[in-house]
Curated annotation (Swiss-Prot):
Pathway entry: Isoprenoid biosynthesis; isopentenyl diphosphate biosynthesis via mevalonate pathway; isopentenyl diphosphate from (R)-mevalonate: step 3/3
Gene: mvd1
Residues binding (R)-5-diphosphomevalonate: 25-28, 82, 161-166, 217
Enzyme Commission (EC) number: 4.1.1.33
Protein name per UniProt: Diphosphomevalonate decarboxylase mvd1
Key word Mitochondrion present: no
Family matches, as SUPFAM superfamilies: GHMP Kinase, C-terminal domain, Ribosomal protein S5 domain 2-like
Keyword ATP-binding recorded: yes
Reactions that this protein is recorded to catalyse: (R)-5-diphosphomevalonate + ATP = isopentenyl diphosphate + ADP + phosphate + CO2
Length: 404
């Protein structure tokens, strides 16, 4: 870290990943603390495909108020209770260090300038808030040189965006709902590192990059208040599935992992449909993707792929690397090789696939047509690591905002 002077700009930069839940988080028992009604579990996706890059900086030369710039646009921090809560908690931890060691520079007293960029559309059902808040918390924690572990920091990230706590770790991550009123036991925990089951792959079918009709927070509140299915899901369905899918991950049992993933996605969207008024996140293209996955599994004679949908129409389809040609190759044959996204670090295995491995007559022809016309791009990815500290700063040594 730079030497202390009146004009010193302190900086730390990190990347953070997107995570896609296989056991869904939906509904809060305490909205102010972002405490969930049920536990959840996700796969952290590779940052070679999707990531948020965030630089946290502080300096006496900055204006008095903290600043946050997201994808080039200034954000109003003062109206975001979630962001304020994260920054307040991180400042308190830094202040404790400074109180214990008076020789440390008083970074907790300096205004922050935080600059963040996603390499994917924000608020389009790609879990941008999870990566965003995880990157913010990790970058500020690094700036402040905090000793807290990712598990401890996950309590803070949770207050920004519930699912952000899971993006502070790589691999397969559980968010334990906890029981305490203060939320101290509601935190993320690594179930298995990416290295335990590195063969996990995913293809994201991007249906629309438009902003969703019903924001997640609003949708959750409606479901909790009006869905009779919801209480049963939270109380009995999810706890059983959490235990079963954690065992499946430890055993690298894809068939069980896949069935639980698909059933839980269906269960989550059933509670949305059971809300009053009903909430529709999936559309005709989403349902065509569901039919395609079941048709591929049926044609192959075993479970080789699994769909899951968050609060949006995009399909995330999990499969193992050894089945890339069967799953992603069939999708490539349906959509055409010129569809945006059939490139990059996870594409090598598909380069020579020119025809569908699964005979297309075994796939619902209506689903094929809907997918052809309804998918704007794909994202090829796989299980990956947690946040990574980098030197690609978005703020210069003199405090100026840079482009990545």
């Amino acid at each position: 870290m730079a030497a202390t002077s009146d004009r010193t700009v302190y900086r730390a930069t990190t990347t953070a990943p997107v995570n896609i839940a296989v056991i869904k988080y939906w509904g809060k028992r305490d909205a102010s603390l972002n405490l969930p009604t049920n536990s959840s579990l996700s796969v952290t996706l590779s940052q070679r495909s999707l990531r948020t890059l965030t630089t946290a900086s502080c300096s006496a030369i900055y204006p008095a108020a903290d600043e946050l710039i997201l994808n080039g646009k200034p954000q109003d921090i003062q109206t975001s209770k979630r962001t304020l809560a994260c920054l307040s908690n991180l400042r308190s931890l830094r202040q404790a260090l400074e109180n214990a060691d008076p020789s440390l520079p008083k970074l907790s007293t300096l205004p922050l300038r935080i600059v963040s960029e996603n390499n994917f559309p924000t608020a389009a059902g790609l879990a941008s808030s999870a990566a965003g808040f995880a990157a913010l918390v990790r970058a500020v924690a690094d700036l402040y040189q905090l000793p807290q572990s990712p598990l401890e920091l996950s309590r803070i990230a949770r207050q920004g965006s519930g699912s952000a706590c899971r993006s502070l770790m790589g691999g397969y991550v559980a968010w334990r709902a906890g029981e305490r009123e203060d939320g101290s036991d509601s935190l993320a925990e690594e179930v298995a590192p990416a290295s335990h089951w590195p063969e996990m792959r995913a293809i994201i079918l991007v249906v629309s990059a438009e902003k969703k009709d019903v924001p997640s927070t609003e949708g959750m509140q409606t479901t909790v208040a009006t869905s009779s299915l919801f209480a049963t899901r939270a109380a009995s369905v999810v706890p059983e599935r959490m235990a079963a899918i954690e065992t499946a991950i430890q055993n690298k049992d894809f068939a069980t992992f896949a069935e639980i993933t698909m059933r839980d996605s269906n269960s989550f969207h059933a509670t949305c449909l059971d809300s009053w008024p009903p909430i529709f996140y999936m559309n005709d293209v989403s349902r065509a993707a569901v039919r395609l996955v079941h048709d591929i599994n049926r044609a192959v004679g075993r479970t080789v792929c699994a769909y899951t949908f968050d609060a949006g129409p995009n399909a995330v389809i999990y499969y193992l690397e050894k089945d890339s040609e069967v799953v992603a190759g069939t999708i490539k044959a349906i959509l055409g090789p010129n569809t945006e996204g059939f490139d990059g670090p996870f594409y090598d295995i598909l380069k020579n696939v020119t025809a569908s491995v699964v005979p297309l007559e075994k796939v619902d022809s209506r689903a094929v047509e809907i997918l052809k016309n309804g998918i704007s791009r794909v994202i090829l990815t796989g299980v990956g690591e947690g946040p990574i500290s980098v030197e690609d700063h978005l703020v210069s040594a003199t405090g100026d905002i840079l482009a990545s």
